[in-house]
């Protein structure tokens, strides 16, 4: 008999709060105390660090009461274009960080928090990345904290396979993801492919620079500088939502109105 593990993925920002609430409330129901499940948190959302803390506090109480641990996948996030479209349409602040440096800094901050011995025994981690610098960072943090048995690396089949093989030589467990689609659902495979192509071609993305990655090369120097900058920023990166709309406190001054200076400006929708 093969044991099943249910893992909730994360897509748009609007699903973050409700997915977290559903995850916690479901596992609090009678009959689920001794079942484990997991969900993903996207580091490109500044809210995710606080959500990780919230889930960890809850999971530690659950574990102390005899319940099973849960699992969190710490990922970078791959739906930026969708978030940008929503932000533009509704005239809302962009929910994710608008630069990769803060994304990587938040990812490292979440990894450090999650790998504290008092946390990771209640919340096991899936460390999702193909970035050799970030993988090495997580590996060293786990060894320093003595928690290597409580996390797995996660990679996508066919991407950076030589890095995956190097990790396997260390003895650290790896979960490899591969998409599966029937002929009738092949359109979803196209969407998946486009996301992977976007990841591979982003100017600051590790995979774009991978083929030119040699010691002291331009790509090596760029990635090294980026990694060091993200380390310096990780304890200062913003935490919490970018959107703070409150209709009760807004000021409706004439000079900010719709027809000020004969220019039409659409009123943003209320973000419920």
Regions found by a protein language model. Name each.
Residues 1-258:
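Positively charged, amphipathic and often flexible ligand-engagement surfaces
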């Amino acid at each position: 008999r093969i044991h099943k593990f249910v893992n909730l993925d994360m897509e748009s920002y609007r699903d973050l709060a409700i997915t977290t609430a559903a995850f916690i409330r479901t596992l609090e129901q009678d009959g689920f105390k001794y079942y484990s499940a997991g969900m993903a948190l996207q580091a490109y959302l500044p809210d995710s660090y606080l959500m990780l803390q919230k889930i960890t506090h809850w999971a530690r109480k659950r574990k102390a009461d005899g319940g099973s641990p849960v699992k969190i996948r710490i990922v970078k996030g791959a739906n930026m274009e969708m978030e940008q479209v929503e932000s533009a349409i509704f005239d809302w602040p962009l929910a994710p960080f608008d630069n990769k440096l803060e994304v990587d800094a938040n990812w490292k901050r979440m990894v450090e928090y999650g790998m504290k011995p008092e946390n990771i025994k209640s919340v096991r981690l899936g460390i999702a990345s193909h970035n050799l610098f970030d993988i090495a960072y997580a590996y060293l943090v786990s060894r320093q904290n003595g928690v290597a048995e409580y996390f797995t690396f996660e990679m996508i089949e066919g991407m950076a396979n030589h890095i995956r093989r190097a990790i396997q030589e260390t003895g650290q467990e790896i979960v490899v993801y591969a998409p599966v689609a029937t002929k009738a659902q092949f359109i979803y495979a196209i969407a998946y492919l486009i996301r992977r192509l976007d990841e591979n071609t982003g100017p600051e993305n590790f995979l774009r620079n991978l083929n030119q990655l040699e010691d002291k090369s331009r790509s090596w120097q760029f990635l090294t500088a980026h990694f060091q900058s993200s380390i310096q920023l990780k304890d200062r990166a913003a935490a919490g939502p970018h959107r703070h709309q409150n209709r009760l406190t807004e000021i409706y001054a004439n000079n900010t109105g719709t027809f000020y200076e004969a220019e039409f400006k659409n009123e943003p929708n209320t973000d419920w």
